[in-house]
């Protein structure tokens, strides 16, 4: 029986891991498996440069930042499994989580599965990605665009 299971390994998942592990709750995180649609570490794994996050005065790549988050969570005792959760039962306690053939029970589950960028499906979107087309207005809004 687990105290806490965290589903997801983006910034929210690692923040949850940090707080719960520091509270001696010994969290178990399912970071997911690398596949066409899923990337452990969340959307930041595809971000080339992060300049708007405290603690990185020179900027950092998304993968470097997520590696730091993972290292810090593991330092405090978070156990991280590279498996994808396929089913969750929240109807009765203890809660149940399925991953492959394994079933896990937990007193609490934190779902931190993030978000996906939504595109219009236009042919030109891919062509102009990061050159005028963006999935993050707050991230990319301050960057100079459309220079000659």
What positions do the PLM features span?
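Short N-terminal binding/cap micro-motifs at the start of the first secondary-structure element
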Residues: 13-15, 36-39
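Gly/Ala-rich phosphate-binding loop of Rossmann-like dinucleotide-binding domains
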Residues: 17, 21
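N-terminal Rossmann-like dinucleotide/flavin-binding domain of flavoprotein oxidoreductases
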Residues: 40, 45-103
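FAD-binding core/adjacent interface of flavoenzyme oxidoreductases
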Residues: 1-7, 22-23, 28-35, 80-147
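Glycine-rich Rossmann-fold phosphate-binding loop(s) that bind the pyrophosphate
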Residues: 8-12
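Alpha-helix N-cap/loop-to-helix initiation residues
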Residues: 13, 59-62, 118, 142-143
């Amino acid at each position: 029986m687990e105290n806490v299971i965290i589903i997801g390994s983006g910034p929210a998942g690692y923040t949850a891991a940090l707080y719960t592990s520091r509270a001696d709750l010994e969290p178990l995180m399912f970071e997911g498996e690398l596949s066409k649609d899923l990337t452990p570490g969340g959307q930041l794994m595809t971000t080339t440069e992060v300049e708007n996050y405290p603690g990185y005065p020179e900027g950092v790549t998304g993968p470097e930042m997520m590696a730091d988050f993972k290292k810090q969570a593991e330092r405090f005792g978070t156990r991280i499994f590279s498996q994808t959760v396929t089913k969750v039962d929240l109807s009765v306690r203890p809660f149940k989580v399925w991953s492959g053939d394994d079933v896990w029970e937990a007193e609490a589950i934190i779902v931190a599965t993030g978000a996906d960028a939504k595109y219009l499906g236009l042919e030109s979107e891919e062509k102009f990605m990061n050159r005028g087309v963006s999935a993050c207005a707050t991230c990319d809004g301050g960057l100079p665009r459309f220079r000659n």
